[in-house]
Amino acid sequence: MRRRLAFVSMMAVLIAAPAGAQQRPLVTEDPETIGSGNILFEGGFDLQKEIFYPVSGLEGDLLRVPVVGLSFGLSSIAEFQLDGGFYNRLHVNHRSPAPLSSMLDFTGENTSDVEDVVVATKIRVLSETPGRPAMGVRFATKLPNASNENGIGTDTTDFYASLLIGKTVQSVRLVGNAGLGILGDPTRGDRQGDVLAYGFSVARAVRQGLEVVGEINGRYQPNDDLEAPPGTDTRAAMRFGGRFTHRTVRIDGGVIVGLTKRDPSFGITAGVTWVFRGFTIP
């Protein structure tokens, strides 16, 4: 099945927003929100080498461009998020037998599709104080926009619930995520795979507007890979990079190093984030 989602672009007057609420090039989620009435737009690209898809059996180099996200500040403590992408292209280097490899419907060495859209809500539960970190929760649902016929998607709906913690110590921002993921089985509609999701990131300001950042982020499948539903296995990756903020615009870049045999051996990412005033909360 093939589905497409078009994002609507919005324009308004620039204003500042909490820098801690902007993650790129990292994916570990900060508990701080972007602020009431603000809109955050981010866009960029990823290039990941030697990534493996266990459901389709494809292995190759993945280009995602653009990777986009929109966040809406619903109040001072709540934020609504939409994340996805318009074009994912996999250059296939190797094919292996897999549960859904017989469903592949493309020829040649390249296959492409859209990115699965993620719809999420983030709520800051506790504000940060000198003696206490900020705490929040995030609930996210991944929609099945990418098709299994193209070998990139799984045609499953996945749900994540995470606890978010963040603390600034002098010039260093520490953020941690921990939660549960409920992932659909692409081969059976009556089965799911439960995983433990986690992330830990560090951002250090080295001069005005400039930060160096790094993280470890992934998910852990407590069951053996042979027993777990395909596509719900353990994943993990490290990201390192930097970002520069000027007024309400931030540019970023980083490298990606996979920590399992299914993750990319190496990758790069770069993008831009813009926060502006979008609407007034009554």
Language-model features: locations:
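N-terminal secretory signal peptides that target proteins for export/translocation
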Residues: 1-3
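Transmembrane beta-barrel domains of Gram-negative outer membranes and organellar outer membranes
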Residues: 21-282
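Intrinsically disordered, low-complexity regulatory segments enriched
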Residues: 5-6, 279
